[in-house]
Amino acid sequence: RLIRRQRQMCIRDSHMSSLNANPNAPSKYLQSKGLAENHIEDNLREFCNYTIFRPSIVFGEKDSFFNKFSTLLKILPIFPLACPESKFMPIYVNDLTEFMIDCILNRETFNKKIDATGPREYTFRQLIDLTLKSLQIKRLIIPLNYTLSKLQARVFQILPGKLFTVDNFKSLQIDSVSSTGFKGSSLVENIVPRYLNASYSQRHFEKLRKKSGRK
């Protein structure tokens, strides 16, 4: 219905996909993203201009990646980490949105897929270590091999909240990196500590105030 309406109005389309999106990818998540890309290419090309953005992890103050792991790391003294050598090139949300805005009238980006990454490559373990450093806490991180990572996914998938699923595990079998496309300039280590540490410090301060009976 949306594509039909875009055809009628000839709206400029900016579609958010994912790095490694492919109908033949190992995970259903990446397959669905790939199918969506194909649908846009097959149905919009003749009617309006589109750009498909394919980012790695997108991070920022309210992100679901660093904030989720910071919450888990505060709770768990021992943290078994699946697929610790999987690679990512996280891109800062401000860099990505500015690039998307610049592309709206840029004809060189019309009807193209564009990978969008940050300037540096990190392993999953490095990102977890950076999260710990940002929170100024220490935890025992246990890197899991392929077999144990898959087992963890199967167990966690049946638990409430589904913190880690088999489909997540399959997605992690492909490194979320790219040597082409747009590269943001913001480094994870320069941005993430600002909001993780500030958030943690504020909540810790509020707890101390409550314990002391102060409002």
What are the language-model segments listed below?
Residues 1, 26-37, 59, 63, ...:
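Short-chain dehydrogenase/reductase
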Residues 1-11:
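Single conserved hydrophobic/aromatic residue that forms the stacking wall/gate
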Residues 13-19, 53-55:
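SDR active-site strand-loop-helix element
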Residues 34-41, 98:
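Conserved active-site helix of classical SDR/Rossmann-fold NAD(P)-dependent CH-OH oxidoreductases
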Residues 38-62, 71:
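Conserved beta-loop-beta element that borders a ligand/cofactor-binding pocket
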Residues 64-65, 83-105, 112:
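Substrate-positioning beta->alpha
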Residues 69-83:
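A short C-terminal helix-loop "cap" of Rossmann-like NAD(P)-dependent dehydrogenase/epimerase domains
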Residues 103-163, 175-215:
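Mid/C-terminal beta-alpha module of Rossmann-like enzyme folds, strongest
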